[in-house]
Amino acid sequence: VNRLDLELIKKLIKDHTLRHADMITKSMIAERYYANKNDILFIEKKTDEAENPLRNADNRISSKFHGLLVNQKASYMFTAPPLFDIKNEDANKSISEVLGDDYAKTCKDVCINAANSGVGWLHYWIDKNKEFQYAAVDSKQIIPIWSKSLKRELLGVLRVYEDLSENGQTYDVYEYWNNTECQAFRKLTSSTVDAGLEAYTMFTSFIVDTEITEQSDTFQHDFGAIPFIPFFNNNISTSDLDDVKPLIDVYDKVFSGFVNDLEDIQEIIFILTNYEGESLGEFLGQLKKYKTVKVENNGESDKSGL
């Protein structure tokens, strides 16, 4: 994909961000369940229960099943991360040194992102010291541009994220990556793409011949490939939560209801009429010991009792 002008990038953003919004919503729900913030915590109490003095308990028990399953999966797969063997001992050692100590953690991060979002993304680059770097990227930020062929080819990547400027204004930043360069754009979060999108000079480059540092909206990476690698959670790119969310919600509802019932049992109100005893302590003692209490009765019309 060649360099895009401002109008083309506006069209690209509008065409793809709308469809990406559904993925963001689902990912945020999965991440919320991963953090043990299940739906049960946000359900409003029923009006009829709120007005019932005998139904005061409102415990919300959120179960961390999704987080436990995802962490177990990531640990099982990447406690010992994949090894590279190119049949050369020195080269294998060099690869291990380049990948560094963060390799296992990064693998787990990508796995967790894929489990929550359906796909995890790895970004790689060359830093200012000319060293190879890589990191997991929040899947909600990445909008892939695929070809329409049967063997889908990654034509470009649109990375979208919020950024706070030095003057305290919030911007939406759009990075468009192809196989040779990255173009940067931004707009105020409060503005629209059509009205507010502009080139963003976020990259700093040093010109050797003139020894001048200049700002640019374009960064040449020259990898010859788009420096983002997708890792799909499964063949249909669904999250791990999709299969278990109904079970988790039912468990939370039943368990929370059970705890509420146990607590509400203690809220029973006794109305005593013509009780023969002299104190409430005696009444509760008889009720506990004999499961009955004695009351006076003054005839058929008398409604003495509890």
Spans of model-derived segments:
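Extended, helix-rich architectural segments
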Residues: 1-142, 149-152
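Extended hydrophobic/Leu-rich segments
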Residues: 1, 9-13, 21-24, 29, ...
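Short charge-dense sequence patches
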Residues: 7-10, 14, 39-54, 88, ...
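Extended, regular secondary-structure scaffolds
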Residues: 111, 116-117, 121-236
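N-terminal start-of-domain structural block
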Residues: 1-37, 197-242, 251
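Extended, charged amphipathic alpha-helical segments
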Residues: 206-306
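Exposed, low-complexity/repetitive linear segments and helix-based recognition motifs
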Residues: 2, 28, 36, 45, ...
